[in-house]
C-alpha cells in the first residue's frame, strides 16, 4: 500500500492530474532544483531502470530525462526509432508487456494512441514526452518557470502567439486554465485551437477563474501580458507548408515592438526551443536562401533581450521531469491534498 497519490500513475496529458496535483509537481520541481544547486543528493529512484523511447527526434526532452534519471539514481536506456518495432514487427501490446517486465518506467515520444496503449499494457508508469496533441512534461517546466519569475501562478497572464492549434498551444491553454493562469492565444483564424480543446479549457477556467482570450488581434491579445510565449511556426512533418505558414504568421512574430505593446516592463519571454532567431544553423541558412527570412517566430534582438527566459525554461525541463518520475515511481509520502 502506498501513501502517494502519484505512485504508479502515468502522465499522458495534463488532464490526467488535478489542479492540486499539478501544483504539487511544480513546487516539488522547485525543491529538487534547489537540492541540485546545493549539491544535495536525492536518489529517490535508486536501482530503477527507465526506458526512453523516441520515435521523434529530441534534444531537450531526451537530455532532460537522461540527466533527471541519473540524478535520481536510476539507469536510463535510450531506444530510438531504429531500436523499437512498435506496431511494425511486434504489436504495441506485446512490446509494452516486455518492456514493462524489464523497466520500472517508460518515457515515450510519438503518437498518442501508442502512448495510451503502452500505459494500458505495460503495468508501469508511462510519461508522454510529446505527442501531436499534448506536451505535459513541458507544462510542468513552463509553469515552474512562471512561478519562479512571478512568485505565483493565479492571475498571471500568459500570451501564446503563433500557431495556435499545435500541441504547445493546446497544453498551455488547458494547463493554464487548470492553474488559474489567464491564457491568451493570439493566432490567425485558421490556426486557432479546436473547439474540443477550447471547451476543455473553458470547463477548467470556470472552476479556477482563468480569464482566457482567443483572438487574431495582436494588439488586443498581447496587451497586459506578463509572459509572451512562442514556438516554431512549422511543426514536425509540416515542412511542405512552410511558405504558406510563414506568410500567415509574420504579424505574430515576437519582436521588441510586440514587447512594448504589452505595456509591462516586468514581462518575460518564453520559448520551448529550438528557436529560429538567426541563420547560425544549416536549417536557418537554407530558409534564408529559399525565402530571404533570417528570423521567424522571434527576432534575435528579442531572443537575446533582458526579458528572455528560454534557457532557464530549458533547464527546468530536467528538474520538472525529475519531479514527475520521482513522484510516480519513488514511493514517496505524498498524501492527497
Curated annotation (Swiss-Prot):
Family annotation (PROSITE patterns): CARBAMOYLTRANSFERASE
TM ranges: none
Xref: InterPro entries: Asp/Orn_carbamoyltranf_P-bd, Asp/Orn_carbamoylTrfase, Asp/Orn_carbamoylTrfase_sf, Asp_carbamoyltransf_Asp/Orn-bd, Orn/put_carbamltrans, OTCase_ArgI
Catalytic activity: carbamoyl phosphate + L-ornithine = L-citrulline + phosphate + H(+)
Pfam families: OTCace, OTCace_N
Pathway per the UniProt entry: Amino-acid degradation; L-arginine degradation via ADI pathway; carbamoyl phosphate from L-arginine: step 2/2
Subcellular location: Cytoplasm
Main location: cytoplasm
PANTHER family: ORNITHINE CARBAMOYLTRANSFERASE, CATABOLIC, ORNITHINE CARBAMOYLTRANSFERASE, MITOCHONDRIAL
Role according to the record: Reversibly catalyzes the transfer of the carbamoyl group from carbamoyl phosphate (CP) to the N(epsilon) atom of ornithine (ORN) to produce L-citrulline.
Family membership: Belongs to the aspartate/ornithine carbamoyltransferase superfamily. OTCase family.
Protein name as it appears in the record: Ornithine carbamoyltransferase, catabolic
